């Protein structure tokens, strides 16, 4: 089943939420306990719509454009882990729907674990997809280069799709289309990313900060998900993380690269539900 192909007829409520420190754009669907989704660097909330459709019969699913991304505010500074974590805490408090399950990919995983460690009273549990401590410098160098290369002018949506398909060769076409249609804005001469290039540069640098304290200190349940062929989280980084926290469950998704939730949405969905229902 192609989950990304099924979203056209499903209704999502999109709105901006003022949490006091910043205004964040969110997409919402469903009812029940609160489940928040946080995307990776340069991405936006739309990438989680296929998963939200499948989970919205049990949960109030809300995907967030994180600061500097999508249609959320883009301050000039403030792109460290604690800045993003404070946004998560502010959003949970503003929504006032009780403690939340956090599902994060990459940057979103880093931010979710940081928030859970810093604000345990606001978080029920975390699904951390393909971002751990101990990521090698070379992997972060490559990520930063990809991020900075994405700030360019595109002639039209087809040019965006072609660029994204080359950048993310394992992401299915329907998921590429979601990224293309949700992540770019018209400007003179074509289309540019909605994500702020200055914010992306600061965020990429911030991903190098030490994540060991957050993983060491977090007391809420955390599921670690890694793509088997991820070029960001190596098998060695995952092994060191498991030695740091042998109590945290791990799912390695066969055949998936870093973009686990888009490449393997069905396995991601099963991992989330098995973890929550355990």
Curated annotation (Swiss-Prot):
Catalyzed chemical reaction(s): 2-(acetamidomethylene)succinate + 2 H2O + H(+) = succinate semialdehyde + acetate + NH4(+) + CO2
Binding site for chloride: 41, 106-107
UniProt entry keywords in alphabetical sequence: Chloride, Hydrolase
The keyword Hydrolase belongs to this UniProt entry's keyword annotation: yes
MF terms (GO), sorted A to Z: 2-(acetamidomethylene)succinate hydrolase activity; protein homodimerization activity
Outcome of mutating residue 130 to N: Loss of catalytic activity
Name the UniProt record assigns to this protein: 2-(acetamidomethylene)succinate hydrolase
Organism, scientific name: Mesorhizobium japonicum (strain LMG 29417 / CECT 9101 / MAFF 303099) (Mesorhizobium loti (strain MAFF 303099))
